[in-house]
Design a protein with these regions (language model features):
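Conserved glycine-rich cofactor-binding loop
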Residues: 14-15
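Substrate-binding pocket helix/loop in short-chain dehydrogenase/reductase
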Residues: 86-87, 94-99, 203
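Active-site loop immediately N-terminal to the catalytic Tyr-X3-Lys motif
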Residues: 88, 135-141, 163-164, 210, ...
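Active-site helix of classical SDR
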Residues: 110, 146, 154
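Residue(s) in the substrate-gating loop at a strand-loop-helix junction
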Residues: 130
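Short C-terminal tail/terminal secondary-structure segment
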Residues: 135, 223, 234-247
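Short, small/polar-rich loop/turn modules that mediate ligand/substrate recognition or access, typified
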Residues: 162, 167, 233-235
Length: 247
């Protein structure tokens, strides 16, 4: 009964990990809002068009939810983009875009939702990190920088708002079979000429468990961090990567 009628907000829940988490929480009984620029293929009364880099759109979306539900219990700041490029290959426009979406958009969302949870004296937040919170990867300096920032944002925010019974954790997936991964592979193939099947085989091969992860596996961990089952867990960088960063 823990999930029954809990109000959850997920950014970027039209596809990938966000969608898997949305479906899991709804199956558990939660009311889940999807804030995303990409419209779902199937009509969803809980879908709100939202560009996370625009503060006014975030504020309007959250206000709309509050007008109807009067509270927000759970937040998963999932929306983000990837960039496969060295520092020299990264344009200023690309830098501004990825920082705006991966970092500033998360800050804007927290800035709006945390006061709501503070007034409620309870809330659970999960931020989307990456295995690159822990390690560096080639051609990933700017993307890794944004995810490192999210890890620190989670830890400091957890400390600041623990007295208000608000928990903040950072989920840190490894390589997961999502549209984001497929776009990254497509870009790598176009850049290097490596056949796509070789790239996917290599991605499986470097994982201790011999395969990449599935969105549903990350969703299950996000649900755990959002739930009361993790009531003494806050400020954690929660790796779900098949053991990749242990190597």
């Amino acid at each position: 009964m823990e999930w029954k009628n809990k109000v959850a907000v997920i950014t970027g829940a039209t596809s990938g990990i966000g969608n898997a988490t949305k479906e899991l929480l709804r199956n558990k009984g939660a009311i889940v809002y999807n804030l995303d620029q990409q419209k779902p293929d199937v009509d969803d009364p809980y879908y709100i068009p939202c560009n996370v880099i625009k503060k006014e759109e975030i504020n309007a979306a959250i206000d709309k939810i509050l007008d109807k539900e009067k509270r927000i219990d759970l937040l998963f700041a999932n929306a983000g983009i990837h960039l496969f490029a060295t520092l020299e290959e990264t344009s200023y426009e690309q830098l501004e875009s990825i920082v705006s979406i991966n970092v500033l958009g998360v800050f804007y969302l927290l800035k709006k939702v945390i006061p709501v949870m503070k007034q409620q004296r309870k809330g659970s937040v999960v931020l989307m990190g990456s295995d690159q919170v822990f390690i560096g990867k080639a051609s990933s300096s700017v993307y890794g920088m944004t995810k490192g920032a999210i890890g620190q944002l989670a830890k400091s925010t957890a400390i600041d708002y623990a007295p208000f019974n608000i928990r903040v954790n950072c989920i840190c997936p490894g390589t997961i079979d999502t549209p984001l991964l497929h776009r990254a592979v497509k870009h790598f193939v176009s850049k290097t000429g490596t056949p796509a099947e070789e790239v996917y085989k290599s991605l499986d091969g470097v994982q201790p468990m011999g395969r990449v992860g599935r969105p549903e596996e990350i969703a299950a961990s996000v649900a755990f961090l959002l739930s009361d089952e993790s009531s003494f867990t806050t400020g954690s960088l929660f790796a779900v990567d098949g053991g990749y960063v242990c190597q």
